[in-house]
């Protein structure tokens, strides 16, 4: 958690106009606008469910998409969706109240994910992977029930890079994330408009605007995902020697040469 949760009316929170005047907000808006254009993420008439947890990434995503919606020459709708997984102490109401204060339609879904994980998780199995699968399923279901054809998630550029490294180091797969992909259910298109934004920019932005950040209150959040944490550390170490490593690795994901890889299914492409 970045800071103690606070009400949306907290005087430290900037107004919408004050936020729009921030140079960093304009830079992030440009990054999201470029991603939306590059990957054809949003079209006329789209109804987009935006996953909002109350964390820095999802808040940033929602604010930037709302700004794009306000300025866009096409018509599309946003619906914020909040999943309360049942972790004791999670304050989904704070998130809902803030989103509602922005005039954005919002749906808070309460689930029993915490009970399911506690009862069903096998010893040694990943807590985070089970939680992620349950939450993803809930988001797809909500997008369907709310009439949304797209689901926007708050993964930023560093998430793409870290996922690439994790799959290479621990899975033996050349795989990261997609910025615009039809989900396995065949109905929901998942978009990730923060692909060109860095985690550092998002942290700085959140520090400037003072939003009511809320922790998910996962009981193992401080002790799990050690592999991803190591990837973050590795990137920081390499960045000392190669300052542009993050932008270079992100660029590599859109500059693939199949003939120079070993996957036989790619031969001839």
Curated annotation (Swiss-Prot):
Cofactor, free-text remark: Binds 1 [4Fe-4S] cluster per subunit. The cluster is chelated by three Cys residues, the fourth Fe has a free coordination site that may bind a sulfur atom transferred from the persulfide of IscS.
Subcellular localization: Cytoplasm
Enzymatic reactions: cytidine(32) in tRNA + S-sulfanyl-L-cysteinyl-[cysteine desulfurase] + AH2 + ATP = 2-thiocytidine(32) in tRNA + L-cysteinyl-[cysteine desulfurase] + A + AMP + diphosphate + H(+)
Keywords: 4Fe-4S, ATP-binding, Cytoplasm, Iron, Iron-sulfur, Magnesium, Metal-binding, Nucleotide-binding, RNA-binding, Transferase, tRNA processing, tRNA-binding
Enzyme Commission code(s) on record: 2.8.1.-
Protein's pathway: tRNA modification
Listed InterPro entries: Rossmann-like_a/b/a_fold, TilS/TtcA_N, tRNA_Cyd_32_2_STrfase, tRNA_thiolation_TtcA_Ctu1
GO cellular component annotations of the record: cytoplasm
Primary localization: cytoplasm
Note: The thiolation reaction likely consists of two steps: a first activation step by ATP to form an adenylated intermediate of the target base of tRNA, and a second nucleophilic substitution step of the sulfur (S) atom supplied by the hydrosulfide attached to the Fe-S cluster.
PANTHER family: AMINOTRAN_5 DOMAIN-CONTAINING PROTEIN (PTHR43686:SF1), SULFURTRANSFERASE-RELATED (PTHR43686)
Protein function: Catalyzes the ATP-dependent 2-thiolation of cytidine in position 32 of tRNA, to form 2-thiocytidine (s(2)C32). The sulfur atoms are provided by the cysteine/cysteine desulfurase (IscS) system.
Protein name: tRNA-cytidine(32) 2-sulfurtransferase
Source organism of the structure: Pelobacter propionicus (strain DSM 2379 / NBRC 103807 / OttBd1)
